[in-house]
Structure formats: C-alpha cells, structure tokens
Amino acid sequence: MKYFFYPKRRFVTFALIMNNNSKSPVSDLQYQQLLLRMEYEYEKEEFKRQTETMGIARKVKRGLCWYPVSPGRSYYNSLNQLVIDITRTENKEIEHSFEFGRPVCFFHQSFDGKVKYMNFIATVSYADEERIVVVLPGAGAVIELQADSSLGIQLYFDETSYRTMFEALEDAIRAKGNRLSELRDILLGTQNPGFRELYPVRFPWLNSTQETAVNKVLCTRDVAIVHGPPGTGKTTTLVEAIYETLHREPQVLVCAQSNTAVDWISEKLVDRGVPVLRIGNPTRVNDKMLSFTYERRFESHPAYPELWGIRKSIRETGSRMRKGSYSEREGMRSRMSRLRDRATELEIQINTDLFDSARVIASTLVSSNHRLLNGRRFPTLFIDEAAQALEAA
C-alpha cells in the first residue's frame, strides 16, 4: 500500500511506505475507491447509529457533543460568512473533537428527553475549550438558535471530506499524458522518480542521517520519501528541508493529515522567520498561532476597514431593497452594483497581498482543496505524517 497525494509539480513526503503488488496504478486507485467507499458507508452508518441510539450524556463524554450550550452574538466574519458564537455551559473539562472545517448540527432536547434535530447543517470556523464559532447557512438559522432555551450541538457526518477524496481519486484515475499521470505512476511504483545532481549542503546542527535526508530532498525532481521510527527527527528534517527549499523557490505548500501537525510545522517555521499563511484555524489557540492564520491576516490588512464598511452597506442596501417599492429598488440597484464591484476589488487586493507575502502556505490535506487555493500552483508540496492519512487524502 502506498500513499497517493493530490498532484503538484513534485512531492516531498514524510511517511512509512509499504510494498504494493497491484497490477497497475489505475487498478490500484480503483481498489482504493472501493476501500474508501466501504469506509464511507461504515462511518455513515456509525454516525446514524450514534445519532439514533447513543444518549446525549455519552456523546458529551466522548467529545462528540456539547450540551447544554448558549448561543451568543451573530456577525459576519472577515470572509463575509454569517457566524454565531456557541459557548458550552457545563462539562467544560471534557476534551472535544470540534475543529475547523468539521460539519455540525444543532438539536433541542424537550422536557421528556426527546431529541429533535434542526433542519440545517453548519460548519466549525473556530474552536477552543469553551467556545465554538459556527458558520451558518442563513439568518433564519440565527433566529432559530437564539429562540431555543435547551440547545445542543454535535458533530455531523463529514460528507465534504469524502466527496473531496472521491474526486481526487477520480481525477488521478482519468489522468493521461500530463504531470498528474506521471506522479501517479511514480508514486505507485511503475515509473522511477528522477533526481538531479547537486553539491551536498552541510547542516552542522543536524545529525548525519538528517543531513543526508535533506540533501536527498533537495535533489529530487519528483518524489522524495523520508521515513523512520518515531522520535528520529523526521519533522525536524522536514522543517530544515522546507527552509532550504525556500532558498531556491518563492513559495511552497505544506500539508499534514491533522490540524495539530500543521500547527507544529507552522510554529517551527515561524520561529525560523519564515512567513507562513495558515489556511484554517489552529487547534492550540494563542496570539502566536492565530497571527499567521488567513482570517487574522485578512482582518489586519490596511484595506479591510473599507471592505468591512462596504459589506455592511451591501447588507443594509439589500434589506432596504426588499422592503422598498419598485421605483426605490430600481434606484438602489446601481448603488448595490457599485458596492459589490468595489468589495470584489478589495477582496482580490487583500487576497493577492496575503498570498504574495507568504513563503509557506500551510493546511491539512483536505483543506488544500479550500476555495482560497483554487487555481494556485506550487513547485513543491511537503506532507508530514503522510502514513496517517487515507490514500485519497
């Protein structure tokens, strides 16, 4: 079994790679599709079973649910998403599994113990020990939540991650005569990776094995794999390889299976003075970790106050248009159009500035499919803890 990664120009993966005896890369990936479908169906049924049979108290203890919770203020975040603060009022000492990007659902428990789920799905934007910020589908959801006095929140089955992985497998299976097909065949063992000859770089602060690994990474044209037992310094080697690669390339993408691993790499790179842009929110929340997240950087941009004001005007104008007469609506349409054009212009400007100033873009594997990264290309992709991920991720 080998790990397949979404295509970039070349890959540096840090994983334990096992033998694969499949007949061809395509048949291997088709088999992975079957395995992923089995896992998808199992998790879906397990979620259904937990939802229908597992009591709230047990789900709370497992970190899958908060109950009771208190809805706080609702507002539009820097990405112009409608969000609401959710705070748990009991069992604050229990660790939970809520984190950025995970879907959630809300429920109400009546006096007789019956649970009724609300008819919408939300997404976690931020989570710490006592508070979750949730992206809502619309203003109606805010009204529904704030009117409920016996509210709970729990993790929902993650269709989005599975959909992303199925699409990645399908893209790789259909690839023909392009860079994706080359990397697919290399990663699955039917084509040898290429390496360039470079004069070895000395790293006196690394041991000889780590130094050799970094130099091997620098010489690769396609794929390099660094593997070894736990505690042998693979992540240290990864950080050094990234740092050295940035002497040769303007920007790289760094991914890991878990948010915790992405946080760890990002923090180490920031300590080395590398400008990092973190897609998604960290699991450990402090000013240092938040300072390089996309949302915090977006809000700190000099053009953001103007953008915030324009977005507010758009919402207010839209509200007046819905309430006004036909002639009034016609008069406001041109204003709305100008406001939207200016908002789009500012969003593009801020987004361009943030990505142009970053040397490392960091995210989980699934979050690398985030809309913010659509259409972007990176000369090199680094993946930490690759053996912990599903092939499709």
Located regions from the model:
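Charged, low-complexity interaction regions that mediate assembly/partner binding
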Residues: 7, 13-97
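Conserved P-loop NTPase motor core of helicases/translocases
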Residues: 190-191, 195-199, 243, 251, ...
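Pre-Walker A (Motif I) flank of P-loop NTPase domains
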Residues: 220-226, 250
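Conserved glycine(s) of the Walker
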Residues: 233
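Hydrophobic positions on the alpha1 helix immediately C-terminal to the Walker A/P-loop
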Residues: 237, 241
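Walker B catalytic acidic pair
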Residues: 385-386
